[in-house]
Amino acid sequence: MKISKKATTIAIVNQKGGTGKTTTCENLGIGLAMEGKKVLLVDTDPQGSLTISMGWQQPDELPTTLSTLMAKAMDDQSIPPGEGILHHAEGVDLIPANIELAGLEVSLVNCMNREKMLKQVLEGAKHEYDFILLNCTPSLGMLTVNALAAADTTLIPVQAQYLSAKGLEQLLQTVQKVRRQINPKLKIEGILLTMTDSRTNYGKQISNLIRQAYGKHLKVFDQTIPRSVRAAETSAAGKSIFQHDPKGKVAEAYQSLAKEVLADADRQRKLSSERAR
């Protein structure tokens, strides 16, 4: 009997740095865990930004990371359940990354089925978790393509400023290409406006511009993530915003985003089961 797939895999992607990908991956993941869901976070960035942000300050010293698991997949070796998974105090699991992943990305180029190595690594985990969140590298290289090939949906954090919105076109083209060539079921979960400042006219103007430009074709999340000094401090502390500033507006925003993502996932599940009848 075939086990029906369980986890919803979300790639958090934007080739531009500084848009709040890592912060969103960590806090959305922990927000979903607070709603009672089993969550796996996967760091696909050779800089190990998510790994460090979650408190593993020396990722290069970790014995097993994503590159270890992907190398096994490339060699057609089996991956024991739970291998390389770290447990975080706030109730989520993590597959960490370090600089070895940069070398692995280069060797992927000559690999058969190279776009699907991450998908292969996550195959077993799909049945163990409700959500798998992939923190993508700030580029559109082979690691990001692997993340898009492994994902059910993609969530795009966009910093609320003019230049950030420009790179969005290029990213959307990449998503379309992956959909056409590798992963026809890939959906866009939505655009998440980060570092918003609703107190200034400029901030409101940008948010409105992005909603007008993309809102007709794509979901732009109602919930935005406000700019906050306290949120910027969390990545240095190895704690999520829920630990660092639980009563603050950013914690509230990520909790609300988690609820929005859950509602979307439930809606998708209902649609899929209706189609299957």
Segment roles from a protein language model:
Residues 1-277:
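P-loop NTP-binding core
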